[in-house]
């Protein structure tokens, strides 16, 4: 999302801000999921986003602004009110994606993660600061409790096999870029793990990543 912070990329911010102003406060019975980003926590606590948060100082807002006019293959105008990701929302989304296919076994890249973020934002209304993972090396666990997909390292041979034999993993050839964008040069793959709905592994292994109330 870093590229979204470039100067001259904020022309669509007015439309995003207007949508935030129009968004109704949602029921407080279901809090945001542990592990979501700052904007989602503000949405849950205040029912809106303080004006102090802008594309200039928040990567998720800048990411949304930079994709306002982008053709992404699904409705550009959000279909539902803006809301923070919840445990149930992440849990249900995980099972939907598992049953429909398309994410399990797909080689991870930042671009693919952004496509997923945009689709979830536009169709479900969940603010895109929920899909974050623990640092590497090794398996990366989701920070958002309820999201049941982790990122697991695979060998170049396995990535090559997936790219050649699995249509859903062939959007980009694994050998082209995957691994090079990772700090530890690992090729990562989305893998469904039902147990992540019972144990918040990220909070246990990396408590320093979570806001202390």
From Swiss-Prot:
Residues covered by region (Acidic): 68-71
Motif mapping: Dileucine internalization motif: 171-172
Residues marked Cleavage (site): 63-64
UniProt region (Binding to ATP6V1H), positions on chain: 154-187
Induction and repression of expression: Expressed early in the viral replication cycle.
One GO-annotated biological process of the protein: symbiont-mediated suppression of host antigen processing and presentation of peptide antigen via MHC class II
InterPro entries, A to Z: HIV-1_Nef_anchor_sf, HIV-1_Nef_core_sf, HIV_Nef
Region (Mediates dimerization, Nef-PTE1 interaction), start-end ranges: 114-130
Main location: host cell
Gene3D superfamilies per the UniProt record, alphabetical: HIV 1 nef anchor domain, Nef Regulatory Factor
Molecular function terms from GO: GTP binding; SH3 domain binding
Note: HIV-1 lineages are divided in three main groups, M (for Major), O (for Outlier), and N (for New, or Non-M, Non-O). The vast majority of strains found worldwide belong to the group M. Group O seems to be endemic to and largely confined to Cameroon and neighboring countries in West Central Africa, where these viruses represent a small minority of HIV-1 strains. The group N is represented by a limited number of isolates from Cameroonian persons. The group M is further subdivided in 9 clades or subtypes (A to D, F to H, J and K).
Record text about domains: The N-terminal domain is composed of the N-myristoyl glycine and of a cluster of positively charged amino acids. It is required for inner plasma membrane targeting of Nef and virion incorporation, and thereby for infectivity. This domain is also involved in binding to TP53.
Oligomeric and partner information: Monomer; cytosolic form. Homodimer; membrane bound form. Interacts with Nef associated p21-activated kinase (PAK2); this interaction activates PAK2. Associates with the Nef-MHC-I-AP1 complex; this complex is required for MHC-I internalization. Interacts (via C-terminus) with host PI3-kinase. Interacts with host PACS1; this interaction seems to be weak. Interacts with host PACS2. Interacts with host LCK and MAPK3; these interactions inhibit the kinase activity of the latter. Interacts with host ATP6V1H; this interaction may play a role in CD4 endocytosis.
Membership in a protein family: Belongs to the lentivirus primate group Nef protein family.
Function text: Factor of infectivity and pathogenicity, required for optimal virus replication. Alters numerous pathways of T-lymphocyte function and down-regulates immunity surface molecules in order to evade host defense and increase viral infectivity. Alters the functionality of other immunity cells, like dendritic cells, monocytes/macrophages and NK cells.
Protein name: Protein Nef
Native source species: Human immunodeficiency virus type 1 group O (isolate ANT70) (HIV-1)
GN (gene name): nef
